[in-house]
């Protein structure tokens, strides 16, 4: 049994005017205006992503930001925080799905700048209705409040996915009743992405 099965990120030695400094791959990506969302979406990861987006806007509001996504999804409210920040800042955002963009991460993928939402050939995109943990206990009025909030979240999700795809709200509502798993080709047809990237060697990819 391995004591630590997680891949260890290498550090890079970089020469500066003050000598050498060690940086990790994520720092190098950030220097190239790349934000990597590779974890579950929760309050902590949302804060990290929002901070990076705001800093990059402050550095240059005219240059694009690239967001790579490989995430199983997560918190609805954390997702909406990232979503609102993406809509708020001035730079255009290219979103690229590597691996998977499930649940909340699928919304983030679709919210990239139109024409700049991409996925690799074997990427997996999953959409479904909001999932909210509930004990099922409490006063009737509290349960009613929770039910109304769940419906509000679902309505927001339906309208938002319809806005960022080529489907109607009615169709999205039907599709998210159960897990809907899309290949990159299916996500392209659905309108959640604009292009499939095959290889940098072959150019941008295919429509």
From Swiss-Prot:
It is an enzyme of class 3 (hydrolase). The keyword Hydrolase applies. It is found in: Cytoplasm. Transmembrane segments: none annotated. The active site is at residues 103, 128. It holds the Pfam family CLP_protease. One of its GO terms (cellular component) is cytoplasm. Its main location: cytoplasm. GO terms for biological process: protein quality control for misfolded or incompletely synthesized proteins. It catalyses: Hydrolysis of proteins to small peptides in the presence of ATP and magnesium. alpha-casein is the usual test substrate. In the absence of ATP, only oligopeptides shorter than five residues are hydrolyzed (such as succinyl-Leu-Tyr-|-NHMec, and Leu-Tyr-Leu-|-Tyr-Trp, in which cleavage of the -Tyr-|-Leu- and -Tyr-|-Trp bonds also occurs). One of its GO terms (molecular function) is ATPase binding. Gene3D superfamilies: 2-enoyl-CoA Hydratase, Chain A, domain 1. Keywords: Cytoplasm, Hydrolase, Protease, Serine protease. Its EC number is 3.4.21.92. Cleaves peptides in various proteins in a process that requires ATP hydrolysis. Has a chymotrypsin-like activity. Plays a major role in the degradation of misfolded proteins. Fourteen ClpP subunits assemble into 2 heptameric rings which stack back to back to give a disk-like structure with a central cavity, resembling the structure of eukaryotic proteasomes. Belongs to the peptidase S14 family. This is ATP-dependent Clp protease proteolytic subunit 1. It comes from Tropheryma whipplei (strain Twist). The gene is clpP1.
């Amino acid at each position: 049994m391995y004591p630590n099965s997680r891949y260890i990120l290498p550090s890079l030695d970089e020469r500066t005017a003050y000598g050498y400094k060690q940086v990790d791959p994520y720092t190098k990506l950030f220097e190239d205006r790349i934000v990597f969302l590779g974890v579950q979406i929760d309050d902590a990861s949302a804060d990290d992503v929002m901070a990076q987006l705001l800093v990059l806007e402050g550095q240059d509001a005219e240059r694009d930001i690239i967001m790579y996504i490989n995430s199983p999804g997560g918190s609805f409210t954390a997702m909406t925080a990232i979503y609102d920040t993406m809509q708020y800042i001035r730079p255009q955002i290219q979103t690229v799905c590597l691996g998977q963009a499930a649940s909340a991460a699928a919304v983030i993928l679709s919210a990239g700048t139109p024409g700049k939402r991409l996925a690799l050939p074997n990427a997996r995109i999953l959409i479904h209705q909001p999932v909210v943990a509930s004990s099922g206990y409490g006063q009737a009025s509290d349960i009613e409040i929770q039910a109304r909030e769940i419906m509000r979240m679902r309505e927001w999700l339906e309208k938002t996915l319809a806005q960022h795809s080529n489907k109607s709200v009615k169709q999205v509502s039907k599709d998210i009743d159960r897990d809907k798993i899309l290949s990159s080709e299916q996500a392209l047809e659905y309108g959640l992405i604009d292009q499939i990237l095959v290889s940098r060697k072959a150019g941008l990819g295919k429509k």
